[in-house]
Curated annotation (Swiss-Prot):
Localization (cell): Cytoplasm
One GO term of the biological process aspect: formation of cytoplasmic translation initiation complex
Alphabetical UniProt keywords: Cytoplasm, Initiation factor, Protein biosynthesis
Organism: Drosophila virilis (Fruit fly)
Residues annotated as domain PCI: 219-392
Family, per entry: Belongs to the eIF-3 subunit E family.
Subunit relationships: Component of the eukaryotic translation initiation factor 3 (eIF-3) complex. The eIF-3 complex interacts with pix. Interacts with mxt.
GO cellular component, one term: eukaryotic 48S preinitiation complex
Biological role: Component of the eukaryotic translation initiation factor 3 (eIF-3) complex, which is involved in protein synthesis of a specialized repertoire of mRNAs and, together with other initiation factors, stimulates binding of mRNA and methionyl-tRNAi to the 40S ribosome. The eIF-3 complex specifically targets and initiates translation of a subset of mRNAs involved in cell proliferation.
GO molecular function: translation initiation factor activity
Protein name in the entry: Eukaryotic translation initiation factor 3 subunit E
Matching Pfam families: eIF3_N, PCI
Main localization, broad class: cytoplasm
């Protein structure tokens, strides 16, 4: 289903190294022409220093089994540059190895003072470490790159011209090495920096748009990600505004997170509002499934859309691992919504709504009742399911109230901050006339 594939759009907001897993994933699908896809990968990898990956892609395109002279020369140049940069940084990294187990490593200022006092540390060394980290990253050596990027973060001032680049580079490298705990820490650090930095409105919007796309990779791979993506995308006004303004297609991932997160059903009401607001700019089977179910109460439409959702998720790199969970939870949502309307339901009718055979549907409902997730009884003789009352728990009501208040508080804080900035700007401008 090429019409629902978001790879082309998502790649516009990702570092080229982060696009490779997405492109390789597509190679295993039959959405696009394989030859054209490999040619695009080759074109992209040629802009990096990953010579072995370039050669491997050439072989897959049947261009040559031997490395061309141009690549041989380029590989030699890359290795020479790498060695030179490593030699420049070697003395200071040796000192870091000595100090890393001591108390000085815990505090940035103490660490820098120790380097300056005992190892003649200079600004040039920091610049060299930054260049080496970037070069290692371009070579595809992400693990080693993270070590130098971490060093830069400890030593570098937040006012340094390269500090923001280091934050982005560290996050990318941790994602590519699948270090999800560290990646989440780096994501939080980068978000805090962007939110507090003195960017123009356009710059801040651009930075948040990029961060939103990168964060999807982290959120769907971290155990806490399903809660955090809802908090950031739905309940942080600055990021919700960025999604609505720049990238409404991200609604797919927010909607998926809400569907597969049974503890956050309270977010459905707010999500549906946003989906309806953005339906004129973005729609796909996942958002349409929720509209069918919770806006139109169209169970037949929801059933058909759920079938389309499976194809969409199967071909989306970000959420493919959630396929089985999504289908299971989506069926549960159909079932719960249907049960609110009908107190007594035939198993055959439910099976039809859930895209299941009657005996499968009966087993599925029995398991729900057995696991205490459903207040219902089955009349096997008549083939009926009789529903009991299912009140909203006090905990869910409390969470819903807190989320609502949190969102309103953050919105008010944003308004006050903008008013304050505007007032300060007017005060500064008034001095121009004196």
């Amino acid at each position: 289903m090429a019409q629902f594939d978001l790879t082309r759009i998502n790649c516009q907001y990702l570092d080229r190294h982060l696009t490779f897993p997405l492109l390789e994933f597509l190679c295993g699908k039959e959405i696009y022409n394989q030859q054209e896809l490999l040619e695009y990968i080759l074109e992209t990898v040629n802009k990096t220093n990953m010579i072995d990956y370039t050669m491997d892609t050439r072989k897959r395109l049947n261009l040559s089994q031997e490395m061309p002279d141009e690549l041989v020369q380029r590989k030699a140049e890359v290795l020479a540059t790498l060695k030179q940069l490593q030699n420049e940084v070697a003395p200071i990294m040796k000192a870091t190895d000595i100090l890393k187990n001591g108390e000085s490593m815990k505090d940035s200022k103490t660490f820098v003072n120790a380097l300056q006092k005992d190892y003649n540390f200079k600004v040039e060394h920091l610049e060299s470490a930054y260049k080496l980290a970037k070069y290692l990253y371009e070579c595809g050596n992400y693990q080693e790159s993270t070590s130098y990027l971490y060093f830069c973060l400890i030593v570098m001032s937040p006012n340094d011209k390269n500090y923001l680049n280091v934050l982005w580079g560290k996050l990318a490298a941790e994602i590519l090495t699948l270090n999800w705990n560290t990646a989440l820490e780096d994501l939080t650090r980068l978000r805090d920096y962007i939110d507090s930095a003195n960017f123009s409105t356009i710059q801040a919007l651009q930075q948040r748009t990029w961060l939103i796309h990168w964060s999807v990779l982290v959120f769907f791979n971290h155990p806490k990600g399903r809660d955090l993506i809802i908090e950031m995308f739905l309940y942080k006004p600055l990021y919700l505004n960025a999604i609505q303004t720049m990238c409404p297609h991200i609604m797919r991932y927010l909607a998926t997170a809400v569907v597969i997160n049974r503890t956050r059903r309270n977010a459905l009401k707010d999500l549906i509002k946003v989906i309806q607001q953005e339906s004129y700019t973005y729609r796909d089977p996942i958002t349409e499934f929720l509209e069918c179910l919770y806006v139109n109460f169209d169970f037949e439409g929801a059933r058909l859309k759920l079938h389309e959702c499976q194809t969409v998720i199967l071909n989306d790199f970000f959420i493919v691992a959630c396929l089985n969970e999504f289908v299971e939870d989506a069926r549960l949502m159909i079932f719960e919504t249907f049960c609110r309307i009908h107190q007594c339901i035939t198993i055959s009718m439910l099976a039809d709504k859930l895209n299941m055979k009657p005996n499968e549907a009966e087993c599925w409902i029995v398991n729900l009742i057995r696991n205490a997730r459903l207040n219902a009884k089955i009349d096997s003789k008549l083939g009926h399911v009789v529903m009991g009352t299912q009140p909203l728990s006090p905990y869910q009501q409390l969470v819903e109230k807190i989320d609502s208040l949190s969102m309103r508080s953050e919105h008010l804080a944003g308004l006050i901050e903008r008013k304050s900035k505007q007032k300060n700007q007017e005060s500064i401008d008034s001095w121009k006339y004196y």
